[in-house]
Amino acid sequence: MKTSTFAPFAKPLYVMVKPVGAVCNLACDYCYYLEKANLYKDNLKHVMSDELLEKFIDEYINSQTMPQVLFTWHGGETLMRPLSFYKKAMELQKKYARGRTIDNCIQTNGTMLTDEWCEFFRENNWLVGVSIDGPQEFHDEYRKNKMGKPSFVKVMQGINLLKKHGVEWNAMAVINDFNADYPLDFYRFFKEIGCQYIQFAPIVERILSHEDGRHLASLAENKAGTLADFSITPEQWGNFLCALFDEWVKEDVGKYYVQIFDSTLANWMGEQPGICTMAKTCGHAGVMEFNGDVYSCDHFVFPEYKLGNIYSKTLVEMMHSERQHNFGNMKYQSLPTQCKECEFLFACNGECPKNRFSQTAEGEPGLNYLCKGHYQFFKHVAPYMDFMKNELMNQRPPANIMEALKNGDLKIEY
């Protein structure tokens, strides 16, 4: 359903939790979060206290307007907190549930998974997201531990444990300069390891040194900055998505779920895309650090985007503040004319504001760095999306497109 006005309490309040802040057992070259530890140099331990855990769980559940409540545990590396921490969290969730249904999902690099962890996740129906960048030669390029040792073998051991215990899991893969030219190797790898739900995230960062030791630029810092070497190019991103889509649409619709394809079809239907990057507005997904500091978004953990602390302001006050509403609405309002006149604005919505540091041909600021790649993708998939939209509108499965392509019933002209 389309909404023309911003209705803050129509959506569940959502805040991801960082129980260990930026602490991690890996040191991935492209990680945007490791350096956030520099924001908390005065804290000896970047560990969430039991007191804060209880305060957050009580307030988070109490602030919900829906019967289902989703907790998302994020890092850093979440499993660097002991299992007892998450057992304590579940006890507190039950204590404060007040009749609501509680769900949990957790993101991990997979290297610390054990039988005990997996038994806990299975018994309590936790969804586990695993960060893995495809086959070993691609994954190990950037995802190494602090000693410079590769992590792929340990990640796969963790995935095999999840499968052994029947834990529901999905994969999140970062697409970078090194792996972007091999989309089919990537995609087929995930199918081979039995992963049905896949998220591909393009990495784009600018280097800009700060006095506190941080080296990544925020959107608010309009200084030029230097594009990080690991960043994907717009052309690589467009080619990656198109090649991957061509195989998926012929063989795997309804069998394997690629987040950006699902979200694109949702936007084609005029429905909510399910991810903030492709929505018209954002700002509904905040993040809370280990000490209770709340920020506008996981990709905006910078001093200028800090909303406050849970000890001095409530989650509702912060997440439904005028400041946060403006942050979310600016996703659309700050778009340059080129975007607002684009035929694919409805599908793209300017993607993530953090990547909007380029200029249009007319010199207007605010263009997404990946614009060319997104446009290439949407132009390429448009006839397929039109077909699948028509199937859904007529209460038929979009997977019918595979048979139509096989039989030559769907002629694609560009």
For each predicted feature, which ranges?
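Extended hydrophobic secondary-structure segments that form protein cores and membrane-embedded regions
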Residues: V15-K18, L70-G76, D103-T108, V258-I260
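Cysteine-centered iron-sulfur cluster-binding motifs in ferredoxin-type domains/subunits
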Residues: V20-A27, E77-M80, C282, C339-E341, ...
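Canonical Radical SAM [4Fe-4S] cluster-binding loop centered on the CxxxCxxC motif
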Residues: F9-E51
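Flexible, acidic/Gly-rich N-terminal and inter-domain linker regions that tether
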Residues: M1-Y14, L26-Y30, E59, K411-Y414
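Radical SAM/AdoMet-radical enzyme domain recognition
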Residues: I57-T72, R81-L219
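Flexible mid-to-C-terminal extensions adjoining Fe-S/redox cofactors in radical SAM and related proteins
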Residues: V301-Y414
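Radical SAM enzyme [4Fe-4S]-AdoMet core and its adjacent flexible, acidic
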Residues: N145-V153, N160, K164-T277, T281, ...
